[in-house]
Curated annotation (Swiss-Prot):
Reaction catalyzed: pyridoxamine 5'-phosphate + O2 + H2O = pyridoxal 5'-phosphate + H2O2 + NH4(+); pyridoxine 5'-phosphate + O2 = pyridoxal 5'-phosphate + H2O2
SUPFAM superfamilies membership: FMN-binding split barrel
GO BP, one annotated term: pyridoxine biosynthetic process
Function of the molecule: Catalyzes the oxidation of either pyridoxine 5'-phosphate (PNP) or pyridoxamine 5'-phosphate (PMP) into pyridoxal 5'-phosphate (PLP).
Enzyme Commission number, as recorded: 1.4.3.5
Binding site for FMN: 60-65, 75-76, 82, 104, 139-140, 184, 194
Organism of this sequence: Rhodopseudomonas palustris (strain BisB18)
Requisite cofactors: FMN
The protein, known as: Pyridoxine/pyridoxamine 5'-phosphate oxidase
Length: 213
């Protein structure tokens, strides 16, 4: 725990005074860069929370595939449970947890689909086997057996022995545009540091508040 609390940020701040940060995306970039060097698996993994039509929450782990000042991007099947829930209620919460650094970041905001061009560009970077799997999978639908899935994969693979695999029309991405960030850092005796950034719209400035642990 003492090692984690002595980390230096590129900005010159230490983990103990990260609360001096004034812009959440820059702070996230610093923390994510450090997590990318310390997390043993998937530093871009994030919990994605959505709400179903009955108001019941659903949460699952997904991989962040990009971020910038406009938000955080992930991809999946449009007809999946998450896709259907986001279509009905385009709001979500994210959680990044980096155990190696004793840190987490929470995000909440509105969700919008990425453009076809953006989805096409990302899909083209996936391995061919992953591209084929996206065509074969009917994500979140009942599956008779693993063998049936493997047969579907083989059928798609046979159609794409040569050449590029196009993006399935039912597979795309979403962008979560933050209205709220919360940065949490572990401290001894549970006297943790927490700061929150809020804004009413993407055009408004951020308001920062320090929170009790």
């Amino acid at each position: 725990m003492s090692d984690a609390t002595s980390i230096k940020h590129p900005s010159g701040l230490t983990s103990g005074d990260f609360t001096a940060a004034e812009e959440p995306f820059a702070l996230f970039a610093e923390w994510f860069a450090e997590a990318s060097g310390s997390e043993p698996n998937d530093p871009n993994a994030m919990a994605l929370a959505t709400v179903d039509p009955d108001g019941l929450p659903d949460v699952r782990m997904v991989l962040m595939k990009g971020y910038d000042s406009h938000g955080f991007v992930f991809y999946s099947h449009i007809a999946s449970q998450k896709g259907r829930e986001l279509a009905a209620n385009p709001k979500a919460a994210l959680l990044f947890h980096w155990k190696s650094l004793r840190r987490q970041v929470r995000v909440r905001g509105a969700v919008t689909p990425v453009s076809d061009a953006e989805a096409d560009a990302y899909f083209a970077t996936r391995s061919k086997q992953s591209q084929i799997g996206a065509w074969a999978s009917k994500q979140s639908q009942p599956l008779e057996s693993r063998f049936a899935f493997e047969q579907a994969i083989a059928g798609v693979a046979a159609k794409h022995l040569i050449g590029a695999v196009p993006r399935p029309p039912g597979w795309s991405g979403w962008r979560v545009t933050p209205a709220r960030f919360e940065f949490w850092h572990d401290r001894p005796f549970r006297l943790h540091d927490r700061i929150e950034f809020r804004r009413d719209t993407p055009d408004h400035p951020w308001t920062k508040t320090r929170l009790y642990p």
